[in-house]
A protein has these predicted regions:
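Gly/Pro-enriched, hydrophobic low-complexity segments
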Residues: 108, 146-247
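Extended lipid/amphipathic-ligand handling interfaces
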Residues: 31, 62-66, 192-198
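Sec/Tat signal peptide C-region and signal peptidase I cleavage site
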Residues: 15-20
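Sec-dependent N-terminal signal peptides
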Residues: 5-14
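Flexible, processing/modification-adjacent segments and terminal tails
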Residues: 21-33, 37-40, 47, 56, ...
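N-terminal secretory signal peptides that target proteins for export/translocation
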Residues: 1-2
Length: 256
């Protein structure tokens, strides 16, 4: 009788763990779905301000166009004037950088820094945590006013920018904080998402604040890190012409 009770308890624990894991995977899928625009195009204007540890700063303004259903995006630099016309084109697994001065395309990686800031080219896309990562650990934690589920995730594909990440997900399934780690566990950068804006039935961050833990300066006992602030404005779901997601578009827009 005692053995039957123990066996039943073990069975219950296993079943409960399986259901819990399934629920967390579904939660990650819901997180991804809220920021992915499969049924329409998405466009927006990005203002990216990088502040170096020495206090100097630089600003980039870019127009972004996404078609998630076809895994495509175009990013066109509008400012500064010296970089105006520089652009990125993503078509599936292929990503090109267009140089308006040399009038040529080169293959590049979504892992690269955008305009030498802490913002990566991959940050222009929606998230795919459920498809690119496995769950190592889950816990509940308070983050300011938000009650969050904290996921420790490890990549199952080499295409992601960071092999390990930790995300704080609030009860509305929006990511409020993100920590990116190297494979060895070194903290690379921390991102905060203080506000979102609703676009149709989905959400786009209104502001992202990124702290780069690899670029810093020590002043006495204080450490100053590189800090990048991203403001996303004028999001639109207007359908863009198919010709926009092509090399010809980036070439043509630079002749105007």
């Amino acid at each position: 009788m005692k053995r039957r009770i123990i066996a039943a308890l073990l069975f219950f624990c296993v079943i409960s763990a399986v259901y819990a894991e399934t629920d967390y995977v579904k939660m990650l899928k819901d997180v991804d779905e809220l920021v992915t625009f499969k049924g329409t195009d998405l466009s927006a204007e990005y203002t990216i301000v990088k502040r170096d540890p020495d206090g100097s700063s630089s600003t980039t303004v870019a127009a972004m166009f996404r078609r998630d259903s076809e895994d495509k995006f175009v990013v066109l630099v509008l400012q500064p004037v010296a970089d105006k016309g520089k652009g990125y084109l993503k078509q599936g697994n292929n990503l090109w950088l267009y140089d308006p001065i040399g009038k040529g395309f080169t293959f590049t990686s979504a892992k690269e820094r955008f305009q030498n800031s802490s913002f990566r080219v991959s940050d222009f896309t929606g998230s795919n945590y459920a498809g690119n990562y496995k769950i190592n650990n889950v816990k509940q934690e308070k983050l300011g006013k938000f009650s969050c589920t904290v996921f420790d995730l490890e990549a199952i594909t080499k295409s992601v920018s960071f092999p390990k990440v930790k995300i704080w997900v609030s009860e509305d399934n929006l990511v409020r904080k993100l920590e990116d780690y190297s494979l060895s566990g070194q903290l690379m950068r921390t991102s905060a998402f203080p506000s979102y804006q609703k676009v149709g039935k989905r959400w786009v961050p209104a502001k992202i604040i990124i702290q780069d833990h690899l670029v810093f300066r020590k002043v006495g006992d204080k450490v100053e890190y590189e800090r990048t602030t991203v403001d996303i404005k004028n999001p639109s779901l207007n359908k863009q012409p198919d010709s926009l997601y092509t090399k010809e578009y980036l070439e043509r827009v630079n002749t105007k």
